[in-house]
């Protein structure tokens, strides 16, 4: 039997409607609306597209947003000065650094300069460490969004053998911590992993984030497994595909995310959730 498609667009819209309702209530109560500042360095076209999507999403849920478009030859000190001002700005609840940054910029130094309670991307060492200690604060958007997708589909994760293919700081590593928190027995594979196929075939829950089109063969997937494809890859013919060979995987999995329309919308929706959460936390200070 073909897999059930996990519709990220549908879930993201439900989340955004809930956020909009809360923002309207805040305005009705005379409270401040959430504010998000985005920093974009250089002319990286995909990054510009992502930032524009986030600006539109902020507008749709009633947030205030601003974007700092900075030249690619900017130095670290200038970016740090901007972040310092945003850290002190009481109208800004979240600060987002659109990655990647130019090679002359130390991205960890930049990310670590954001105060943790405004780190709505969840990349600050404090927030990563809090997740590791099982006391999550602001959590990385894509991994948190994936957990939300599973919950919306009433997929029970406790006791599942989860295999994370990819070990990036943005997805793979924080996702492995989320999976542990969700009660999974978790395996993380990476570019040095031997016999990847063997690991994949043993996965009850498979999450793939390597950034290579159709990298993982659908025939490797265990019948009845849950497949989450994080990859977004554009082929020469313009078609957008994931990291998993979808047609074959669809016939073997019990649940699967499409590309596009799966994980992507959830990442943005989770960013909005984090920004609202940060705003509410700032109210309590």
From Swiss-Prot:
PROSITE patterns: THF_DHG_CYH_1, THF_DHG_CYH_2. One of its GO terms (biological process) is methionine biosynthetic process. Its EC number is 1.5.1.5, 3.5.4.9. It catalyses: (6R)-5,10-methylene-5,6,7,8-tetrahydrofolate + NADP(+) = (6R)-5,10-methenyltetrahydrofolate + NADPH; (6R)-5,10-methenyltetrahydrofolate + H2O = (6R)-10-formyltetrahydrofolate + H(+). One of its GO terms (molecular function) is methylenetetrahydrofolate dehydrogenase (NADP+) activity. GO terms for cellular component: cytosol. The keyword Iron does not apply. Pfam families: THF_DHG_CYH, THF_DHG_CYH_C. It comes from the Bacteria. Pathway: One-carbon metabolism; tetrahydrofolate interconversion. NADP(+) binds at residues 166-168, 232. Keywords: Amino-acid biosynthesis, Histidine biosynthesis, Hydrolase, Methionine biosynthesis, Multifunctional enzyme, NADP, One-carbon metabolism, Oxidoreductase, Purine biosynthesis. Catalyzes the oxidation of 5,10-methylenetetrahydrofolate to 5,10-methenyltetrahydrofolate and then the hydrolysis of 5,10-methenyltetrahydrofolate to 10-formyltetrahydrofolate. Homodimer. PANTHER family: C-1-TETRAHYDROFOLATE SYNTHASE, CYTOPLASMIC (PTHR48099:SF5), C-1-TETRAHYDROFOLATE SYNTHASE, CYTOPLASMIC-RELATED (PTHR48099). Belongs to the tetrahydrofolate dehydrogenase/cyclohydrolase family. HAMAP family: THF_DHG_CYH. This is Bifunctional protein FolD. The gene is folD.
